[in-house]
Each structure stands twice: as C-alpha cells, then as structure tokens.
C-alpha cells in the first residue's frame, strides 16, 4: 500500500517556527518518517505572525473566544479561521493529523482559555482555532497531538485508524464491490475489537451490495468504517477475539504452548504484557500450521511491524 498521508505541525521536527523560534524534536514523529508521507503546516506563520513572534492566546470575551496577541492587541481570530477554512477546502485528502499540543492554533482539546489578555486566570480548555477548522471540515480524519501520543494505547489506536483508512482509500478508488468484500473479510477481527455491532452492520451492507449502486455502498462503508475505528478498541473484546483466533490452532499445540498462551493472555488482561506479544505468538503458529483465514487478518499487523516497539514503549 502507499504510505499514509499525515498532516503535521511544522514545529514538530520540520522547521524552527515556534513562537520562540525553536523546533521541537519528537521521537514518535521521527519513528513515523519512513512509514508515512508528512504534510507539514504552521498555521501561525501562514497568517503572517512571523518567527519569532509575540505569543498568542485564546481569550474569552462577550463575543466568544478570540485568538489574541496580548503584546500588540491584535485579534488573529478571523485570519486564522479564514486560513483554516481555505486550507481544508483546498488541501488534498490525508489519512490523519498529528498536531502540537496546547497550541492556541493547533491544540486538539487542551488549549487554555483565559479570562483576559494578560495576568488573567485560566477559565476553560478548548481546541485551537486551526484544529477546530480541521474537525469541522474533516470530522472523520484521526487527529491527535504529540502530548497525548505519549500514551501507548492512544498511539496504537491512532496508528490503527491511520493505516486502516489509508488501506480503505486505496480499496475505494476503483469502487469495486469484490475489493470491499475482501477488505471487510480481512478486517473482521480488528473491527470486532472496536465494535462487534458495527462490524456486523458493515457485513450486512456489503452482503446486500448488489441491491445498490457500488459507489454508494463504498461511500457508506467508508463512513461506517471511520465511525467504527473512532471507538477505542476494548480490552474485553480484544481478549475474546484473541481467544477465538487461538481456537484455530490450540488443538495442534503442546500443553506447554497452550499454557504459555493462556498465561500471556492473562498478563495482557492485567496490562502487564503488550498486545503485540500475543499477536507475535499467534503469527508464529498461524505460519507453522498454514491457517490461511487467520493469516489474512489485519489485526495481526494493523501497521508496520517496525512501529510495534514504538507503540509498546512508554506508559
């Protein structure tokens, strides 16, 4: 498959464009470089704030939250909204967004809102103005900030969404129902860890595909896929899926191997072992016994194996 396309805040390793003229080195961004195509953007530079610049903040006013530059008194709200609207209307499609946390322009949800221009208390948290435009124009695009992505579960969820949606984008180009059916079959187990009911509804959609125009089915499937993947995978559902997969090979394993898997599953349930360890075990047995149905399941490797260690590291 082609590399997924990720929108990224330019200050995260691409240019020294922060308000203080600095660049931020981010390990996760660096690990992704071989596997994704980055589209860097700095919204604050694009609206002419310059580098370095006087800091901006979001200020709550009687007219709503405004993006203000206290040192100059400049109200940057409309300029940023205009840039965001134009950017997301004209930019090509992308598979995810990785933005700068707490930035008044790019923060996803943790941007401080102040009661006044200077020496004023924080009264709320919100999304940055550019990030809000992203959510309005591209609501199905997985979007995270580098702060939240220090969490292993959030990293895994983000990468699943990005790589799955990129795979579907390639599948959807031809609008061929046979390709969508194959896609759904390969993603069944992964989707079950997010929402079994959504997986079954998507299965009914493709099964009845002959009653509708193929393009309509493909578009509806894409919407359902994005909604299903937006739900974080549930541990209980993941354990059930792993047990189901284990059932395909368990009768051909030794007693010691079965015991090892079940004890590993319990350690995963207790958050003492990463999911990748169990998937690696299953992959080895699937290859050993040539279990073709399981070999095609994307859950076993939803993103490049080289990123497993990145996902498993940290908290």
Residues covered by each model-derived region:
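N-terminal extension/subdomain marker
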Residues: 1-4, 16-18
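Short, hydrophobic/glycine-enriched beta-strand segments
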Residues: 5-12
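Short beta-strand segments
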Residues: 9, 42, 98-102
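N-terminal glycine-rich anion-binding loop in soluble enzyme alpha/beta folds
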Residues: 16-17, 21-66
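A charged helix-plus-loop insertion that forms the helical arch/lid used to bind
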Residues: 57-74, 112-124
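Glycine-rich anion/phosphate-binding loops
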Residues: 72-92
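Internal, conserved structured core segments that host functional sites
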Residues: 89-171
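Acidic, Ser/Pro/Thr-rich low-complexity regulatory regions
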Residues: 142-315
